[in-house]
A protein has these predicted regions:
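Catalytic core of bacterial c-di-GMP phosphodiesterases, primarily the EAL and HD-GYP domains
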Residues: 65-123
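Short, flexible active-site loop motifs that bind/organize anionic cofactors or intermediates
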Residues: 21, 62, 111
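Conserved protein-kinase N-lobe ATP-binding Lys motif
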Residues: 44, 57-62, 92-97
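Active-site core of bacterial EAL-family cyclic-dinucleotide phosphodiesterase domains
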Residues: 2-57
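Structured helix-beta-strand junction loops
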Residues: 15-16, 60-61, 82-85
Length: 123
């Protein structure tokens, strides 16, 4: 079965044309920023697809882990510059552990490499 926009999806993955943005998570009692939610965005240079489209296509072509791995890796690298002790919230597809290419411990290893303490990461 041909998946609509699959070619565009693969080009985005190949170019790694995804970047993170960070949404502040604010403590309503104090007004302090408690952490940041990592959200992925597409470099819209050559595509009309949205990030939500990518996750739908990834599911259809069996590449959810490949996409999620790219998003996590980019977020962790960028989070190296976050304020000390600020939490980093990562969104995770609950079914990802079922993916045969899923790598257990990936987030811990990439966080350590990026200098982000694992105790600051919330999934």
């Amino acid at each position: 079965m041909k998946v609509k926009n699959a070619d565009e999806f693969y080009k985005i993955l190949e170019r790694k044309a995804i970047y993170p943005v960070f949404q502040p998570i604010v403590n309503l009692q104090t007004g302090d920023v408690a952490g940041y939610e990592a959200l992925s965005r597409i470099d819209r240079h050559d595509t009309t697809l949205m990030i939500s489209d990518l996750f739908v296509i990834a599911e259809q072509v069996g590449c959810v882990w490949k996409l999620e791995k790219l998003c996590r890796n980019k977020a962790l690298k960028a989070a190296a510059n976050k304020p000390e002790h600020a939490k980093l919230f990562l969104n995770v597809d609950g079914n990802i552990i079922q993916d045969k290419s899923f790598i257990q411990g990936f987030t811990n290893r990439k966080a350590a490499k990026a200098g982000v303490p694992s105790c600051d990461i919330c999934i």
